[in-house]
Amino acid sequence: MTDHPSSVRHVPVIDVSALVVREGDRSRTADEIGRACRASGFFYIVGHGVDEGLQRRLEESSRQFFAQDLARKMEIAMERGGRAWRGYFPVGAELTSGKADLKEGIYFGQELAPDHPRVKKGIPLHGANLFPRDLPALRDAVLAYMDAMTELGHALMEGIAVSLGLDASYFADRYTREPLTLFRIFSYPHEPAAVGDGPRWGVGEHTDYGLLTILKQDDAGGLEVKSPDGWIPAPPVPNSFVCNIGDMLDRMTAGQYRSTAHRVRNLTSRDRLSFPFFFDPDFDAAIRPIVEADATLVASDRDARWDRASVHEFEGTYGDYILAKVSKVFPQLRRSTS
């Protein structure tokens, strides 16, 4: 593995078992993560400890849900989720850079009861999930999977903290004692159509908003990572997850750790499933740099980013940042989260 981003040709694979079980050479694992974050912001993880049977149940129940007719899926439409921003959306309802993505999906988050203080206050992105009434296996798998991912997210953020020369508890002490955890299940139809003079992407070029994304993908492939030399494929690796850092970690590290653009297209003759889990700062956490910003890095960030917007100019809480993004992804839900 190399630190120089221009020489990145593939996404590295890192065994994180030392972080998960909190034994062995954690510093070595943290160093590998640090090199990957500086080079491309993307890396596979193995040795993560997430039960393979749970992953199979999640995939099987998800396929059952998406195989239903549209009317049945719309019974848990996002419009019914209100300020919690949960539920199903059909193909074309989600936008990236103002263009409709060729995918459908379900949005989930931490399951919170109506009497939870943040739900009672009406804080957006907090509340109960919407689950299909006739697929209890999906509910069980989603909630168990989110618990496992949250635990894994804490372990990985400890490794990222150590990779930066910080105490392992740095992020938990300041940002993720109560992380904003968001989970998506996406289904990409197998018949992508051309739009105008180019392809219609499952997800167009974008970066993620928060700290860390942990992605489970099926064996169809299609994820691509942007590099100075072009787009690098990130094909499926058995029993691995793809991790990438988000805009807030890019901001915190003054661009040393890169929130790298990526995109998705369907490369096979069948539908593709993906399962991104977002481990993000607390909604009310004010995002501040860990180190002094390097003006050169900040300038090159603006020039290179897909949206020509520097994350290093952002001031405010993570809630401020993600709500501004929500209004662009789902314009029709803007009123419910404002």
Language model feature labels by segment:
Residues 1-97, 102-103, 125, 143-144, ...:
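C-terminal flanking tails of non-heme Fe-dependent oxygenases
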Residues 18, 109-110:
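Residues that line or immediately flank small-molecule/substrate-binding pockets and catalytic motifs
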Residues 110-141:
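A short, charged helix-loop
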